[in-house]
């Protein structure tokens, strides 16, 4: 390898920069490079440190030569190999789709046809390896890479699967190999984990576990540690994986044959290569694969299964909507579109286009529109089988009420299209608006008479963005459409998507008409929910899931997904269409009261635009004429909050797209405190009350989103028409975000996401115990969130944000860069390795950490003693001491060194004991070599070495002192480390109490904590029971004082 210019390094005919880091593991680092002449040829350069390799370098070279000869489309190609003094460089094929582990993390599960596509390619690579006698022995999703020739949004059928990282594990040192096993024990065969003799069938077991995870989302046999998994395999002679019932027979038989504990009973390679499931002509259960999700750094994709909750995806943005719209000219065309979607499975279109839609099963009736018009639910609900057809089949004629006996004479035509509606039987009556909505009703009438709205018929087939899109069917209204509103009917048949009119996924908060059948909830609230059956599963006639139009949710979660079912709100006659959604059944969260199922918040991808609960949905891209009754300025950083407010019954209409600096022009508060903030729901008489489960959003969240914005200057409504006042609360300090104070181009106001649940009961509106994640530019107050520690600034008023400790970053994309539909990504923090470790490992690590903290405090005391000794050696001090008759005081410098030596000896003893404990626990297998353990042990070792060096230096410095001053040795025996530590702790408590008495409380709490830590350490080292009891009493007093002090600060 030769260093190039600008930090570019060369490996043979290839070059790379260490800035382009792709990934790293326990033994190697991978960089992205390219060919020096053919720049379009991208490669991956893996750098392996020779310290991680065993002595058999010649065998590694032979193995690499063999791998260079393996030319297969499903094996990562090895282009070049260079061995340097300290490292080995492997130049391999670059795969732009990431690995299968990331793919499954995004999609959770794959359909059987996608599993077969991937498995056929894996089998092709294994056929070549098996013919050459090569055993992989480490097959796992992380070692299966994906390549997308067609780009990031390639169809799953176009994804190329490639096996990587085989043959190298055998040359790793034994202890390093043990660390690797901690990462992937679930995919290793039982004979490998139990250290028995194994052959090539071990790879077949790994393939079985990978297929099982692709199908169900988890490994077939799991344990908290490799030791537990080994014990599980040793105790259970027969293993039977839990295969879902709806799995096809060929795939079930394949899994059972691959996942045999005894390798003799396991199928061989010939049976595997010729298995019926791998045969493309074998009829299996079809499920359309979901398009490939967009990764930040790769373009791999997946397919979604109908058996589990899919990963969160984003709805289409406003920029994508014009490409997704389909124009309908009549109700018959609208119904025909539904029929066409159902029958389009046999079309000869491109696979990318057909796979973007889900084919409605043939058993669904074709006269959906006719039955919807008669105010009856369809006999069989449109349940999407795991993918995302979006059809809003609800019909409603705004401003018209049905006659006492509404009937609709329509019969489906032979082509499946319904006949025309006899809408002349229905009498039309003009609804009387409430007094506060007179102006809005006049605007509504103007919109109804607008020629552009009467002549424009819209319908859009929603394409899935990422993996899926929020799906739902609008429910039918008892009001049939009039014969003059054919265009409006086509609009109401629009298959809703990312427009403001499309409802977002939420269960149990939509008021219902009396004509709809309902599912009783445990609390008595009426909830219409349903779950999509697997393809081929039958739905009984009496099943509750057939009573509502349902679908699987693949969209981003709203902040109110965990709301308790609220009482039904009275709906005016002009209320827009509602929609019911069927959330996926997940096993992780406990069901909320009143909900059939609820989904945990998994971050926040792009949220759909907020609901516009005006009587008419606006035309996409046209200005809105209807005036809002509650006029909230729409900022890019508050889209998700507007969704929540609209869902809770607040009528909102965006006047126009405005940014925060525009709003600041109409804001009379330029950093001043304003009135009472948000009024309670009972004062406003509006449906803005908090439900019992709104722990994900507090009143502080609403203040942060809307508090810094005054009423929109472009609105013609007066303040008297707005019964709700949005202003920053005086209890929160009344201060604005720095970006909101300036009149220039500044960042939008921060949106505060509360993480975790508040205490039981109602959360105070002025609560400051929240964690702030700023949505917006980098100038937001708190853009870094910590998953472990939260620190509140003591003594600060409400304007001081909560400072999160350094940790994992919850990065939220800038909404300005993505317009109003910008992707809001939540990067979940990685779980610490100790999460799945055994209790003995956790307890030992806690003990090591405590030893390290205690030793550091003792070293601070030793440093203070050393500084006092240095000061005593100064000329001024010696001049003053020359007149003192006491000889011991003349030797104060040496005395300080003696105290320092005793403390360093104590530290060395503690650290030596901790290191020995770690070694014993590691040898016993109770302490795993995780990165945290390595870091703590490394720090313990460093401090131990430093303490030993300090002891040696001090002993040399005091050697003459001990020889000349023999009489002082008797006094030195009375100096013990425990006595010095106790004395220092008492002094710290006394000084803190003295400062507290004089109202200097800034540094009291840290000193109390340090003293408490020192006393805790003494309690572990002392042997005299009386001393231990005295220390316990001192600790109790300090803890009481700390409790009183903290309650006074945070009150």
Swiss-Prot record:
Q: Which residues carry this modification: N6-acetyllysine?
A: 162, 606
UniProt-annotated stretches for the region Disordered: 283-323, 335-358, 394-554, 661-686, 727-787
Q: Where are the transmembrane segments?
A: none
Q: Catalytic site residues?
A: 138
| Annotated ATP binding sites | 22-30, 46
Q: List modified residues, type Phosphothreonine.
A: 456, 574, 635
GO terms of biological process kind? autophagosome assembly; autophagy; axon extension; axon guidance; axonogenesis; cellular response to amino acid starvation; cellular response to nutrient levels; cerebellar granule cell differentiation
Q: Where in the cell is it found?
A: Cytoplasm, Cytosol; Preautophagosomal structure
**Residue ranges with Low complexity bias:** 295-318, 340-349, 400-423, 774-787
Keyword Nucleotide-binding among UniProt keywords: yes
Stretches the record annotates as C-terminal domain: 829-1051
**Pfam families documented for this protein:** ATG1-like_MIT1, ATG1-like_MIT2, Pkinase
Kindly give the Gene3D superfamilies that the UniProt entry links to this protein: Phosphorylase Kinase, domain 1 (3.30.200.20), Transferase(Phosphotransferase) domain 1 (1.10.510.10)
Modification after translation: Autophosphorylated. Phosphorylated under nutrient-rich conditions; dephosphorylated during starvation or following treatment with rapamycin. In response to nutrient limitation, phosphorylated and activated by AMPK, leading to activate autophagy. Under nutrient sufficiency, phosphorylated by MTOR/mTOR, disrupting the interaction with AMPK and preventing activation of ULK1. Ubiquitinated via 'Lys-63'-linkage by a complex composed of AMBRA1 and TRAF6 following autophagy induction, promoting ULK1 stability and kinase activity. Deubiquitinated by USP20; leading to ULK1 stability and autophagy initiation.
Q: Where is the composition biased (Gly residues)?
A: 731-745
Q: What is the effect of changing residue 162 to R?
A: In K2R; abolished acetylation by KAT5/TIP60 and decreased kinase activity
What result follows from mutating residue 624 to A? Does not affect phosphorylation by AMPK in vitro
Among the GO molecular function terms of this UniProt record, one is: protein serine kinase activity
Q: Which SMART domains match?
A: S_TKc
The family note in this entry says:
Belongs to the protein kinase superfamily. Ser/Thr protein kinase family. APG1/unc-51/ULK1 subfamily.
How would you summarize the oligomeric state and partners of this protein? Interacts with GABARAP and GABARAPL2. Interacts (via C-terminus) with ATG13. Part of a complex consisting of ATG13, ATG101, ULK1 and RB1CC1. Associates with the mammalian target of rapamycin complex 1 (mTORC1) through an interaction with RPTOR; the association depends on nutrient conditions and is reduced during starvation. Interacts with FEZ1; SCOC interferes with FEZ1-binding. Interacts with TBC1D14. Interacts (phosphorylated form) with TRIM5. When phosphorylated at Ser-317, interacts with MEFV and BECN1 simultaneously. Interacts with TRIM21 and IRF3, in the presence of TRIM21.
Protein known as: Serine/threonine-protein kinase ULK1
Name the species this protein comes from.
Mus musculus (Mouse)
Taxonomic lineage from the root: Eukaryota, Metazoa, Chordata, Craniata, Vertebrata
């Amino acid at each position: 390898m030769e260093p190039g210019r600008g930090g570019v390094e060369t490996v043979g005919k290839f070059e790379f920069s260490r800035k382009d880091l792709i990934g790293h593991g326990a033994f190697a680092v991978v960089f992205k490079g390219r060919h020096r002449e053919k720049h379009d040829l991208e490669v991956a350069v893996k750098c392996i440190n020779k310290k991680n390799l065993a002595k058999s370098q010649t065998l590694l070279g032979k193995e690499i030569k063999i791998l260079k000869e393996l030319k297969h489309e499903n094996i990562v190609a090895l282009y070049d190999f260079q061995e340097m003094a300290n490292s080995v460089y492997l130049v391999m094929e670059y795969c732009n789709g990431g690995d299968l582990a990331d793919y499954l993390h995004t999609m959770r599960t794959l359909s059987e046809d996608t599993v077969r596509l991937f498995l056929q390619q894996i089998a092709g690579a294994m056929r070549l390896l098996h013919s050459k006698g090569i055993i992989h022995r480490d097959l796992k999703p992380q070692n299966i890479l994906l390549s997308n020739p067609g780009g990031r949004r390639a169809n799953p059928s176009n994804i190329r699967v490639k096996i990587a990282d085989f043959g190298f594990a055998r040359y790793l040192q034994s202890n390093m190999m043990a660390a690797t096993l901690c990462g992937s024990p679930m995919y290793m065969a039982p004979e490998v984990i139990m250290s028995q003799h194994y052959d090539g069938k071990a790879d077949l077991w790994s393939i079985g576990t990978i297929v099982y995870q692709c199908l169900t989302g988890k490994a077939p046999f799991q344990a908290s540690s490799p030791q537990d998994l080994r014990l599980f395999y040793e105790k259970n002679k027969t293993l039977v994986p839990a295969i879902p019932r709806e799995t096809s027979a060929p795939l079930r038989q394949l899994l059972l044959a691959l996942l045999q504990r005894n390798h003799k009973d396991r199928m061989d390679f010939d049976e595997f290569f010729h298995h019926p499931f791998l045969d493309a002509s074998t009829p299996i259960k079809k499920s359309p694969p979901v398009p490939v999700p967009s990764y930040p750094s790769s373009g791999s994709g997946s397919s979604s299964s109908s058996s589990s909750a899919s990963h969160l995806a984003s709805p289409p943005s406003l920029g994508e909507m014009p490409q997704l719209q389909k124009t309908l000219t009549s109700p018959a065309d609208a119904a025909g579109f539904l029929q066409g979607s159902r029958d389009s499975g046999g079309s000869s279109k491109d696979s990318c286009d057909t796979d973007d839609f889900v084919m409605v099963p043939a058993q669904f009736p074709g006269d959906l529109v006719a039955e919807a018009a008669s105010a009856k639910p369809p006999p069989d609900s449109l349940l999407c089988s795991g993918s995302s057809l979006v059809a809003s089949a609800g019909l409603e004629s705004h401003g018209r009420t049905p006659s006492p006996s509404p009937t609709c004479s329509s019969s489906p035509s032979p082509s499946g299209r319904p006949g025309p509606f006899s809408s002349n039987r229905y009498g039309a009556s003009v609804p009387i608006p409430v007094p506060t909505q007179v102006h809005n009703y006049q605007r509504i009438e103007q919109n109804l008479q607008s020629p552009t709205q009467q002549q424009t018929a819209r319908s859009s087939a929603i394409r899935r963005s990422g993996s899926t899109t929020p799906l739902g069917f609008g429910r039918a209204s008892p009001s049939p459409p009039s014969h003059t509103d054919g265009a409006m009917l086509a609009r109401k048949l629009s298959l809703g998507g990312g427009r403001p009119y499309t409802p977002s996924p939420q269960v149990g908060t939509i008021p219902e008409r009396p004509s709809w059948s309902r599912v009783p909830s445990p609390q008595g609230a009426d909830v219409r929910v349903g779950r999509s059956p697997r393809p081929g599963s039958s739905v009984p006639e009496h099943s509750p899931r057939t009573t509502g139009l349902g679908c699987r949710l693949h969209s981003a979660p709203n902040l109110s997904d965990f709301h308790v079912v609220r009482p039904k709100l009275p709906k005016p006659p002009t209320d827009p269409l509602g929609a019911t959604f069927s959330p996926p059944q997940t096993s992780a969260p406990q069901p909320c009261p009143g909900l059939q199922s609820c989904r945990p918040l998994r971050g926040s991808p792009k949220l759909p635009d907020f609901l516009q609960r005006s009587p008419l949905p606006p035309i996409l891209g046209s200005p809105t004429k209807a005036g809002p009754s509650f006029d909230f300025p729409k900022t890019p950083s508050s889209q998700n909050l507007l969704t929540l407010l609209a869902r809770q019954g607040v009528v909102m209409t965006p006047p126009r797209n405005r940014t925060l600096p525009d709003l600041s022009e109409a804001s009379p508060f330029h950093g001043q405190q304003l009135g009472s903030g948000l009024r309670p729901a009972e004062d406003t008489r509006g449906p803005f009350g908090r439900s019992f489960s709104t722990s994900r959003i507090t009143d502080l969240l609403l203040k942060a989103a809307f508090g810094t914005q005054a009423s929109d200057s472009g609105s013609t409504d007066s303040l008297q028409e707005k019964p709700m006042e949005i202003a920053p609360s005086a209890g929160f300090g009344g201060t604005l975000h720095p970006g909101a104070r300036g009149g220039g181009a500044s960042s939008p106001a921060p949106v505060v996401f509360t993480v975790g649940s508040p205490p039981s009961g109602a959360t105070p509106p002025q609560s400051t115990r929240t964690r702030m994640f700023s949505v917006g530019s980098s100038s937001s107050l708190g853009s870094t969130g910590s998953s472990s520690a939260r620190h509140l600034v003591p003594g600060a008023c409400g304007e001081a944000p909560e400072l999160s400790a350094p940790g994992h970053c919850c990065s939220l994309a800038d909404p300005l860069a993505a317009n109003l539909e910008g992707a809001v990504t939540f990067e979940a923090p990685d779980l610490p390795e100790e999460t799945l470790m055994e209790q003995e490992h956790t307890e030992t690590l806690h003990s090591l950490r405590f030893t390290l903290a205690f030793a550091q405090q003792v070293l601070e005391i030793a440093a203070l003693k050393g500084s006092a000794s240095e000061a005593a050696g100064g000329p001024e001090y010696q001049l003053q001491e020359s007149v003192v008759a006491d000889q011991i005081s003349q030797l104060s410098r040496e005395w300080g060194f003696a105290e320092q030596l005793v403390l360093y000896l104590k530290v060395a003893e503690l650290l030596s004991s901790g290191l020995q404990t770690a070694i014993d626990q590691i040898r016993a297998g109770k302490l795993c070599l995780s990165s945290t353990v390595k870091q703590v042990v490394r720090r313990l070792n460093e401090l131990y070495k430093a303490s030993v060096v300090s002891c040696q230096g001090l002993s040399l410095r005091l050697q003459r002192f001990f020889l000349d001053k023999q009489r002082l040795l008797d006094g030195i025996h009375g100096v013990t480390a425990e006595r010095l530590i106790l004395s220092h702790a008492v002094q710290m408590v006394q000084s803190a109490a003295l400062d507290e008495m004089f109202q200097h409380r800034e540094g009291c709490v840290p000193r109390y904590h340090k003293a408490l830590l020192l006393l805790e350490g003494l309690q572990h080292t002392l042997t005299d029971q009386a001393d231990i009891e005295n220390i316990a009493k001192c600790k109790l007093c300090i803890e009481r004082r700390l409790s009183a002090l903290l309650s006074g600060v945070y009150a």
